[in-house]
Amino acid sequence: MITVLVLNAGSSSLKASLYRLAPEIGATAVRPPAPLWQGLLDWGQNPTVARLKVTTANQHYEANLTHPEGGIAGLRDWLKSLLDTLTSGQTKLLENLAEITIIGHRVVHGGSRYQAPVRVDAQVKAAISELSEYAPLHNPANLLGMELMADICPQTPQVAVFDTAFHAQLPAVARTYAIPYELTTAGIQRYGFHGISHQYVSERAATLLQRPLAELHLITCHLGNGCSLTAVKGGVSVETTMGFTPTAGVMMGTRCGDIDPGILLYLLRRGWTVAELDRLVNRQSGLLGVSGVSNDLRQILAAIDQGNPQAQLAYDCFIYSLQRGIASLLPALGRLDGLVFTAGIGENAPGVRRDICRGLGWLGIELDSTANEKGQGDRNIALPTAPVSVLVVQTQEDWAIARACGQLLSLPISS
């Protein structure tokens, strides 16, 4: 058995999970096990105070951690405190951190050079740093997580698993923007994101449908605060809605998705700065911007119940954006065997699933209202007679990263 620690390091939070698995499980396991331990550090409200939460099968622990400086020094101390809960106290699972066989990291942007998980070395770190220009909110935090873990567990190998890797085989017509080609060759192209999630749920969908993934044409819908849709043909991503950055595509919680680029030129001419435009498209738009209420769909639905017309408009725009996004992926597939919903909204908002599917009846989509509203777990919520399956699948990105680590360890090490 191997012990895998999975880290998802962000700019204001860090999530971690611990799994034990046999090396060959990466290629054979279908239904993911629950993590043995889950940890969270959240310093989003105050850069000098982190909220620590740890959960195991039968224990839960919370604490507030403070550091006078915050920043990297604070995170280093907080991460050590988080990992201490693995080796001491009521959540203890390990005698020492040396029992961790391998550490897997989610990395948002791998550009065009990383099409599979890789062992982290100096060259990989340098590349992730270079790609920070493409993902300034994510890659630096991902890289910092690697650096800190190298200090804490210097003998433990680390693996980078890239969110862009699943989309690395996008055909040229899907990844190329209609801009001068020298810009394309300079790296400005559609990369796609949420790939770890899209790949996992497409594989899980094939298991639920009891059909080979190689013969399925699926659209996977990762709907959370960030949203993206992907056309998966025979297990390969052939089109996706996010692009050069995670700002593109469908309407999201705070991101605008696709808009006329002339809007940004117009605002630049009116004196807006690049930083202001960045905040506009990434933090002030989407459901939050249109509703004026929140990026949280639950609060928008509550506002709708209170008769707020702006909240209703935001919801309607969101549903329409997703319907249009789904339809836009059909040419890449030719036919549709299954529509897959995942992530926070996709898994937990039956009303959203219902309203999206209401506009897609022409595709052969017919929901079983009972399965949609009251069903639990991974399931098919389409009517048995419907020609297109509609699946709800709980995304398991941490497990997918752990599995990738297991697969990498089972490969022979080249000299």
Swiss-Prot record:
GO terms for biological process: acetate metabolic process; acetyl-CoA biosynthetic process. Mg(2+) binds at residues 8, 397. Mg(2+). Can also accept Mn(2+). SUPFAM superfamilies: Actin-like ATPase domain. Disulfide bonds: none annotated. Pathway: Metabolic intermediate biosynthesis; acetyl-CoA biosynthesis; acetyl-CoA from acetate: step 1/2. It is an enzyme of class 2 (transferase). ATP binds at residues 15, 222-226, 296-298, 344-348. It catalyses: acetate + ATP = acetyl phosphate + ADP. It is found in: Cytoplasm. Keywords: ATP-binding, Cytoplasm, Kinase, Magnesium, Metal-binding, Nucleotide-binding, Transferase. The active site is at 163 (proton donor/acceptor). Its cofactor is Mg(2+); Mn(2+). Its EC number is 2.7.2.1. NCBIfam families: ackA (TIGR00016). Belongs to the acetokinase family. This is Acetate kinase. It comes from Thermosynechococcus vestitus (strain NIES-2133 / IAM M-273 / BP-1).
